[in-house]
Amino acid sequence: ALIAGYESQQAFSSIFKTMYKQTPLEYRQNEVFYPLQLEFTLNKNPTAPDTMMQEISYATLADIPDWMNFITLVIDGFPCLDENSHLEQVKQYVQRRQALIMRDGSTIIGAAAFSYQTGSIDFLAVHPQYRHYGVAKAFLDFMMCNLFVGREISITTFREGDKADTGQREEYKRLGFAESELLTEFGYPTQRLILPPKQEKGDNG
């Protein structure tokens, strides 16, 4: 702790618990280790599609290897994510046509998985290099116009004040999501956010 620049072991433990929601000892004893950020390589020639929604397609089984590589770039938004479990879930979403991707050339720059039944977005992530390109909004617009017409959409994210949040919660609220109930998912404190149905022009209701 001292070598890393912390004033004391207590200071390190306090900050560690703020980020991981458990003490260093509990973290070791649980033997379930997960990163809050991994190294990633930037796309040397990024481009912003002129028509984002037109670049969205349903993911296929052939896309899954790229999807799993993409996961390592966006791990900061998914504490406690287990890659093996996620892989099995992605296969199911793909087979049900409930998984979407967006690419810049061969690079996946965004991915989403959702449930028709519950109206929930169960996974939504954007490549760190493209988080100011409107990718998340494009996915939402696509789903609201094609999949959840007239329905509200829900998503879960970090709770307010979570030090592990790199801006995901703020982005969702900027896109129109409103706070709903507090949850605990996979042992991690989260909160459900709700996006109301998109109103058509002239709809006074």
Which residues does each predicted region cover?
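Conserved active-site alpha-helix within GNAT-family acetyltransferase domains
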Residues: 10-19, 137, 160-181
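Conserved catalytic-core motifs of GNAT/GCN5-like acyltransferases
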Residues: 23-29, 156, 169, 173-192
